[in-house]
Amino acid sequence: DAREWGFYRGRREANNVTMAVKPGNARGDLTATHVTWKHQRMVPEVPSPLLLNGILYTVKTGGIFTAMLAATGEIKKSARMTGALDAYYSSPIAADGKLFLCGEQGKVAVLKPGAEWELLQVNDFEEPIYATPAAAGGRLYIRTASTLFAIGAEAAR
């Protein structure tokens, strides 16, 4: 139908970007005056980026994980996460000194953060994950299609 065609046409023509914009009171087209840097490649379709210690992290479908300097946009490392080549709808999260990324097919990649990030391990929850994990009270909460997992130290009584 026409609505479906419009959706797919718009998706094909989408011009997704990751960019840094200077804050201020400007109005109108700020491209020439307030955009510090811009990338049109390696841009995620759904997940939000994660900013941690001056490094902006993004994950793209196919398990492509990118670390760039937030101040300049310089890409420090962009590579596929072996064992976690998946579609990503949830956003990366930082907890317990690590980065966690949940893929649609249930793979959870655990990474050492930094400009030259390192894939530490991949865990398979064996069912879809669409939600971004949450961290609270020393635990990581991961929601799969049928279960909410609480991972971490047992609470003191």
Predicted regions and their residues:
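Noncatalytic, solvent-exposed loop/strand surfaces
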Residues: 1-157
